[in-house]
């Protein structure tokens, strides 16, 4: 028997709408997102765990890390992955005390919880990120 919607639970409708909004927002940030002051805070709020790669155009090791970040973004769809060019956004880099490049900061619930400086193997970075997904 088909439902005409009259007997639908309003609480279920509210939850479905909230989930749809959440998924739509996450789709906006799929893959590795180029971050700026315009979208940085919103990006962190969108994901329970977010990873930000701080880089610069003159930094050769940063370009070695980029494919690792891209692979992790494909393999870990529940985690937000972003890259922030420190030359274009020095204020954000300074806010998080980024002194060396590349620096990867892992955020949980919008707060920095871990930091990796330099190029590291994918497995090491992946394990560090997974540690914040478990609780």
Where are the language model's segments positioned?
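Hydrophobic anchor residue in the Rossmann-like NAD(P) cofactor-binding loop of oxidoreductases
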Residues: 86
